[in-house]
Amino acid sequence: LQTINKSLITITAFSMLLASTASNSAPRIIPKAPTVIASSHILIDFDSGKVITEFNQKEHLAPASLTKIMTSYAVFSELKQGHIQLSDEVTISKKAWQTGGSKMFIEVGKKISVEKLLKGMIISSGNDASVALAEHIGGAEETFAELMNQYAEILGMHNSNFQNATGMPASNHYSSAEDMAILAQALIRDFPEFYKIYSEREFIFGKELKSGKPIKQSNRNKLLWRDDSVDGLKTGYTKAAGYCLVASAKKDGMRLISAVFGADSVEARARESQKLLNFGFRFYETEPVTEPGKTLS
């Protein structure tokens, strides 16, 4: 019996060695990147800047509220340089108040802190908050847009031009999936202390006129509820842009950034973004999984 047991142990050990050797020598199987149903998309590795997969990534497209990622980058830069403070009180102009589209619901003449306006812009996607911040920094939204373009040039966003701080439709206002990935990478890298705002799921500000109840607005990034690894960034929609989403997720020490332009619906932009992130986390390690990738710069 002792001899049989020794033989079994020897056979088992040899079998395990063979299995291990076979596993180590097996070719790495990497499938083709998934088809993304959108006008343009890109997926990059945050640390290296390598492109994992992309489609029409340089195409000039309407960015809608993805514009606010650049607006926030400029505001964060002003904060970091000490030109403004989170506690600064901003007097709301008529122009900011009457700006159309999604709103934080601020009122003319009221004083609102930079911190609250940032949250209203990022979480609630408030166009009114975006204009108020732009005016606080640049004096006029048009001047602030010039500042946005200067930052875009510094970051190497060669396929972007901003005419306003909101992303409302305007001639010659455009960006690209690649540029938005570059911007998201820079924002997370340069302003980790402020980036966390993008992970907040809701923002409460103001009161309903009839009931007096606080107005609670939810972050439009559905992935914040669906995937614990996702911690930002921003959605966007206009008729011209379609449904857009720039997202970032971190898992097992690796961070990925995806950008999707021109999806068909709120659900589609979340689904297609999730598709990209899942693919990247499953098959990307230290090298691009498709053709030899390039570094975003």
Predicted feature descriptions by range:
Residues 6-7, 69, 251:
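Hydrophobic alpha-helical segments, especially transmembrane helices
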Residues 10-19:
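Bacterial N-terminal signal peptides
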Residues 17-18, 80, 276, 284:
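Hydrophobic alpha-helical membrane context
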Residues 24-195:
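Active-site-adjacent loops and short helices of periplasmic peptidoglycan-processing enzymes
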Residues 157-161, 169-174, 178-297:
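Domain-terminus/edge residues, biased toward the C-terminal soluble/receptor-binding domains
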